[in-house]
Amino acid sequence: MGQGLGVETAEVWMFDQTSSVGGHTTQVLGHPQVIETPLGKAVQFNGVDDALFVPVHPLAGAATWTWEVIFRPDADGAPAQRFFHLSVLDPATGKDTDDRLLFETRIVNGQWCLDSFAMAGGQSKTLLNCDKLHALGKWYRVTAVYDGTTLRNYVGDELQGEGSVRLVPQRPGHSSVGVRINLKDHFKGAIYEARFTRRALTPDEFLKMPTPH
């Protein structure tokens, strides 16, 4: 699954069960379902109360990084949904801080656009381009890349947006899948795979979409 990347630089989470992802035991909220899809097994979220919490921040400590998710946003979800959230925890209190990485969708006129957000050390950047709309109910790979100076996001290999920002490395924390970390803005759809790489990849290095079967 590493596709030539060293195991020390990339971590892969396959969503083929709900009790663990990427070797990490999950906290299951609601009743997310393992489903069979043309790509293989995936986890489906109902957009109401389904979520998985994972007790790690897979990009903590990375000065540059690439975050990829293969997912399917459904047609009848809420207008704004948070489908993946990496959150930094305060080591003194154990509470969530404002430092975070987020993947979100916005539904506009029956289609969706990608919203990516990154914040660390008081600096932040939002990438949201709803001029680039995509059909709901299909499988996509979305990607956020930070190269040390610029944050970029992609749907497939197509750049959606970019902006300059200076982000210090994220500190340790945890992750939520299917909802924002504060249990708001649930996601309706399915997630097949995520990959977290501790360097900035170019589009030709991005995770390959599996062949439907």
Where do the model's predicted regions map?
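Flexible glycan-contacting loops in extracellular carbohydrate-active proteins
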Residues: G163-I191
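Short, aromatic/His-centered strand-loop micro-motif at the edge of beta-sheets
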Residues: D115-R141
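Short strand-turn-strand beta-turns centered on an Asx-Gly dipeptide
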Residues: Y154-E158
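Extracellular glycan-recognition modules
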Residues: G4-T25, Q33-E36, N46-D115, L136, ...
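Localized edge beta-strand/strand-to-loop motifs within extracellular or lumenal beta-rich domains
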Residues: K138-R152
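Beta-strand-rich interaction surfaces with strong enrichment in secreted/lumenal proteins
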Residues: V54-H57, L128-L133, S164-R166
